[in-house]
Regions:
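C-terminal low-complexity, Ser/Thr- and acidic/Pro-rich disordered "stalk" regions positioned immediately N-terminal
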Residues: 385-441
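C-terminal membrane-anchoring or membrane-association module
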Residues: 454-472
Length: 472
C-alpha cells in the first residue's frame, strides 16, 4: 500500500473519530434537556397551589383556605403565595391574623363563598382586628355578591379585582378599619355596580378608604358616616355621598374628599352627605342635593358647576372657552396652569382673583373681567366688566442716527510747496526701484522648492519600480 493511501486512511479514521465524539456530545446535550424538562414537568404536576411562609417555616397547601387556616393569630406577618392560577374556595381572615396574599402574577378565582352563617355571599371576608395585603395579581369571582367584605386594615397594591356582571354588587365593601388602594391597582365593578364603598354599619366605625393610585371602574359610594379620600388615580363612574335609612340608623353624614383624583363621572352629595374638592379633575356634573353644599377650593371642571356648589373660599376662579368647549378652573395652582396653557383664539373669563392682581396672558386671547375689582393684564388696567384682546407686543422703534458733522475744508496748497513735494516724490520713486520685493521672492522660492521635492520623489518611485521589475 502506498504512502499516499496510508495517509488517506489515517485521515478518514481521524475524521470518523471526531464525528463520533461530536455525535456523543449532541446526545448528552439532548438527554440533559429532555431530563430537565421531565423533571420540571413532574415538579409542576406535584407542586401544590399555595406556599405559606410564616417565620422560618415554609409549607405548601392545595388551597388558599387551608393556608389561611394555618396562619397563627398572633399578629405575626405570614405570606401566602400562589404558585399557579387557583380556582376554589374563598377565605375568612380572623382577628389578629396578619396575611400578605402575594398572587405572584396569577389569578385566584373564587367559586365557593364565605361569610356569616346563612349569608355566605362574600368571596373573601376580612374580620375586625386582622391586617391584610392583596398584591401582584388578580382576584375575581363569578358567584360572589361582594368580592371582599372588609372590616380590617387592608392594602390593595398592584392588584386587579373584578366580579360578575348582573351579580356582583360591590367589589370592596368597607365597614371598618382602613383601606388603601395603591400601586397601579385596578378595581373593576360589574356593569352598573359599585367599585368600593365606605359605610358605618351596625356597631362598626366606618371604613376609611384612600385611593392613592390606579384605575377604578364603577361607582364610589360613601354612606352613613363612611369616609373616602380620592387623592390620586382615576375613577370612571359616579362619586356619591349619601345616607339610607334602616332600623336604628344614625343620621351621620358621609364624607368624601377629592384631592388630586380624576373623576370621569358626576360628583353628588345627597341627604346629609358632605363632599369637598381641593384639586383634581371632574368631567361630569358637580352638585349637591344635601343640606350642605359641595365645597370647592381647587380643581378643573369640564362641566359647569351645578346647584349648591360653594366656591366662596377660592381665591382664583375662571372659565375658559375653547372651540365651543368650556371648563372652570378653581384655585391658584390650577388657575396658573390654565393661564400658561392658553392659546390664541381662546377666551378666559376671570370670575375671582385678588384685587389689583397682575396677570400675563398670551397674545390672541380674549380676557373678560367678571370680578368686582380692577386687575392688570399685560400692563394694562382692566376694570370690572371690561374685556380686552391681547395684541402682539410692538417692537421698539429703531432710533434715527444723528448726522455726522461736516469736516472743515482743507486749505489751498501753495504752488511752491507743490513743486517741492513733486521733487521729493520723484526722489522716493527712483529710490523705490532698487528696493527688493521680499514677499514675492519668498513665495517664488517656496514654489521652486516644492517643485524640486516633487521631482525627486517621482524619480525615487520610478527607480524603485524598475528595480523591483528587474528582480522578478
Amino acid at each position: 500500500m502506498s504512502e499516499y493511501n496510508m495517509e488517506e486512511i489515517f485521515m478518514e479514521k481521524k475524521l470518523l473519530k471526531r464525528s463520533l465524539t461530536f455525535a456523543m456530545m449532541i446526545a448528552v446535550v439532548f438527554s440533559t434537556i429532555i431530563a430537565s424538562s421531565f423533571i420540571k414537568a413532574n415538579a409542576a404536576e406535584t407542586e401544590k397551589a399555595v406556599t405559606l411562609i410564616q417565620g422560618e417555616k415554609t409549607s405548601q397547601y392545595d388551597t388558599v383556605q387551608e393556608a389561611v387556616a394555618a396562619v397563627s393569630a398572633d399578629k405575626t406577618q405570614a405570606v401566602i403565595t400562589l404558585n399557579k392560577d387557583f380556582e376554589g374556595a374563598g377565605a375568612v381572615v380572623k382577628k389578629d391574623q396578619n396575611i400578605v396574599f402575594n398572587l405572584n402574577g396569577f389569578t385566584w378565582t373564587i367559586n365557593s363563598l364565605v361569610g356569616s352563617s346563612g349569608t355566605e355571599t362574600n368571596g373573601v371576608q376580612l374580620l375586625q382586628g386582622s391586617t391584610v395585603t392583596i398584591e401582584n395579581g388578580t382576584l375575581t369571582s363569578k358567584t360572589a355578591s361582594k368580592l371582599i367584605q372588609n372590616y380590617c386594615d387592608l392594602t390593595i397594591r398592584n392588584a386587579t379585582l373584578s366580579g360578575q356582571d348582573n351579580l356582583t354588587e360591590i367589589i370592596v365593601s368597607n365597614n371598618n378599619g382602613s383601606t388603601v388602594i395603591t400601586g397601579n391597582s385596578t378595581v373593576q365593578a360589574a356593569a352598573g355596580g359599585i367599585a368600593f364603598d365606605s359605610d358605618k354599619w351596625g356597631g362598626y366605625q366606618g371604613g376609611n378608604v384612600t385611593l392613592e393610585d390606579g384605575q377604578v371602574i364603577g361607582n364610589v359610594n360613601a354612606t352613613n358616616g363612611g369616609k373616602i379620600s380620592l387623592n390620586g388615580g382615576t375613577v370612571t363612574g359616579d362619586v356619591i355621598a349619601s345616607n339610607y335609612t334602616y332600623q336604628g340608623n344614625e343620621k351621620t353624614p358621609a364624607n368624601i374628599v377629592i384631592d388630586g383624583a380624576t373623576i370621569n363621572g358626576n360628583v353628588t352629595a345627597q341627604n346629609v352627605g358632605n363632599i369637598s374638592i381641593s384639586s383634581g379633575t371632574v368631567t361630569g356634573l358637580v352638585s349637591s342635593e344635601s343640606a350642605s353644599p359641595v365645597a370647592v377650593t381647587g380643581g378643573v371642571f369640564h362641566t359647569a358647576l351645578g346647584e349648591n356648589v360653594d366656591i366662596s373660599a377660592a381665591e382664583y376662579v375662571a372659565s375658559i372657552e375653547s372651540n365651543g368647549q368650556a371648563k372652570t378652573v378653581v384655585g391658584k395652582t390650577d388657575f396658573d396652569a390654565a393661564v400658561q396653557s392658553l392659546k390664541s383664539g381662546e377666551t378666559i373669563n376671570i370670575q375671582v382673583v385678588p384685587e389689583n392682581s397682575i396677570l400675563t396672558i398670551p397674545e390672541g386671547v380674549t380676557v373678560t373681567n367678571k370680578t368686582n375689582n380692577s386687575i392688570v393684564v399685560n400692563g394694562n388696567a382692566l376694570n370690572a366688566g371690561e374685556n380686552i384682546i391681547i395684541q402682539p407686543e410692538q417692537p421698539e422703534p429703531t432710533p434715527t442716527p444723528e448726522p455726522e458733522p461736516t469736516p472743515d475744508p482743507e486749505p489751498t496748497p501753495n504752488p511752491e510747496d507743490n513743486n517741492n513735494m513733486t521733487e521729493s516724490n520723484n526722489n522716493e520713486q527712483s529710490g523705490s526701484l532698487t528696493s527688493p520685493q521680499t514677499g514675492n521672492d519668498s513665495y517664488s522660492i517656496l514654489y521652486i522648492s516644492l517643485a524640486f521635492a516633487s521631482a525627486a520623489l517621482l524619480t525615487m518611485v520610478s527607480f524603485t519600480i524598475r528595480k523591483m521589475s528587474k528582480s522578478k
